[in-house]
Amino acid sequence: MTFTRRAALGVVAAAPVVLRRALAQPDAIPIGALYPLSGALALLGDESFRGLELAVEDRNAAGGLLGRPVRLAKGDAFDPNQAVGEVRRLMDAEHVAAVFGTYAGPLVFAASQVTELAGTPYFELGAIADPVTERGFKYLFRSCPVASAFGLLTVDAVNDALAPLWGVDPKSLKLAILHEDALYGVTVSGFQAARCRDLGLNVVENLSYGAATVDMSSVVQRLRSAGADVVLHTGYQNDVLLFFRQMRQMGWKPRMIVGAGGGHSLQDTASAVGADCEGMLNADFTQFAVNEAAAPGAHDVQAAYEKRYGTKPRSGHSLANYAGARLFLDVIQRAGSLDKDKLRAAVLATDLPSGATAAGWGAKFDEKGQNTRAKPMLMQWQGGSQVTVLPEAAAVSKLRPTFGA
């Protein structure tokens, strides 16, 4: 191809136009997106990231943030050490104005120590461990419910809903608490044990295991020997799959499993387990199969998700991250500035009633930075899908008494 003088003159003539357009476009605001995008938590991390990505795309379509487009800078935090390294890179190389994330408690626990020292706002959308917001940090804010609420709901579901459905005294049931041994599992299980004590329920086992374990046969054997009727299980996808596989291999299952989010929420888990997970209960973030009167806009988010990614959502983690990100992006807009103290003041001044977001949550933040109007819901796997069964205002199906194939 010959590069003619006419073509060259055209390029020269066009250059001022391109330059003027570039100068007319405001610089994008870089926002950090810190999630586990590889490793054992990658599926849940990616599903969570998609919610943030949708919220940012909506904000940009509506004119951006503070008159500028938002640019997401991704960081892969597959373990706490990597989370620290990635958040430093996001601040030093990408010059992010804030960090959004992160799904897992150990990751945000580590990364937020770095951002707090630097005075960079950190908006947590999905890690539930209570201690995350109990360290006296000024610039860490969390939109989602906490582990204590998950623990309370899982136990109350047995006491107030499941036992009456079975026609038995809840105190006659043998409950077992099973959890992975990191921040997520330890926190949820601690609140479960405390709630069981308060209600006088019979806990026959309280077992922990490493999330990277490859053998849970001894766990299954102890649960079988204890005669557990209900297992309250807190775990990630790989260990949930392992637990189900070894229950099947050993020919045992409890009368019911009640999950606390994590791996119990994923459509991929249900697809892999098959009919064995039918009827399993799960306390978690709002899922897409919800009465929209309680979660206005949830179905619109699902439609946008399917259009953007060409598939159905894998869990409600995308919805939770979307709702939280929209909330915090609106806060930044109202603050009128990226100044950390103005952002903190705007967060603490936020006052939205329950049902004001697509996840059905409201927004009112305490001095610790925790949203006190975010609550989990109770779901059940029915016909291969996870549907909301409690609270009644959000339910799209009735609670069923049976579990398993």
How would you name each of these model-derived features?
Residues 19-35:
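C-terminal segment of N-terminal export signals and the immediately downstream linker at the start
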Residues 2-24:
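N-terminal export signals
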Residues 96-204, 255-282:
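Extracytoplasmic ligand/sensor domains, especially the bilobed periplasmic-binding protein
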Residues 247-322, 392-404:
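Extracellular/periplasmic periplasmic-binding protein-like sensory domains
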Residues 305-318, 329-388:
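Segments of small-molecule ligand-sensing domains
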Residues 32-53, 75-81, 103-104, 178-187, ...:
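Extracytoplasmic "Venus flytrap"
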Residues 42-65, 190-195:
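Short, polar/charged alpha-helical segment
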